[in-house]
Amino acid sequence: VLGRRLGGELLRLRDAAAKTQQQAAEVISATNSKIVKMERGWVPMRDPDIRALCEFYGLVDGKAVTQLLELARLDRERRKAKGWWQDSPHPGALTEYIAMEDAASRVRTWQLSLVPGLFQTPEYARALAVSEGVGPWEDPAEIERVVDIRMRRQDRLTGERPLKVYAVVWEAALRQLIGGSVTMRGQLERLLEIAGLENVRLQVLPFHAGGHPCVTGPFTILSFNEDEAVDVVQADTIASSVWVENEVTSSAYGDLFDRTARRSLAQRDSVQLIEAIRQEI
């Protein structure tokens, strides 16, 4: 997050100065690719590079330059501190998502066919990990690591800095028997417990709501406490996960989420539906 803030500020300064990535790269004897990575916050940044770019972009405010250098220092320190998620067997994109989730203050998630990962029981998560076409893991030890990582993510729900979670789930996700009836009953019981947390809002979009705006697939919106931090959207496609970090598009996803939530049952009614489905299974 710190790297993204710093990179975003450098991008803003370059745009304001009407400079190209090629020109910026020449100033610090780098490639265009490095400038792209810097502006997206993907790499740690050296103080000499930041000073040179600020001078090139015409930033003469010494205090502003000092603030950027401090952001760079904090970002470098954070990168050195190994996060608990870095031992994850997940693919790189998912590991990156877990790191972002750990830094977030609020999560809004829409799920079509699965219970959100933050709400899953170990049994449900394990069943997903071994399901053909869902989990790529075959080694039992690796499967348990996947489950452990998912459970560790849930510490944010009740930890020192509780994560605010607003989840909207299609009714299909509650009726799909992942792992069998016993596992699914346990999962629905877990949802009923989680719905009682003050920092969790859970709504179900019922079948009888008919067509809805979010037919294209699941997505999650991550929000951060940092000033002027743009929401980050992670959306799943057939082949990969797509990241959205620009204000216009992330705002569009936020509007899409809100419209779907308005068509969903209120939390109290959602809890009643979950209980009814649990009794049916």
Predicted feature descriptions by range:
Residues R161, V168, L174-I281:
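C-terminal regulatory/effector modules of DNA-binding transcriptional regulators
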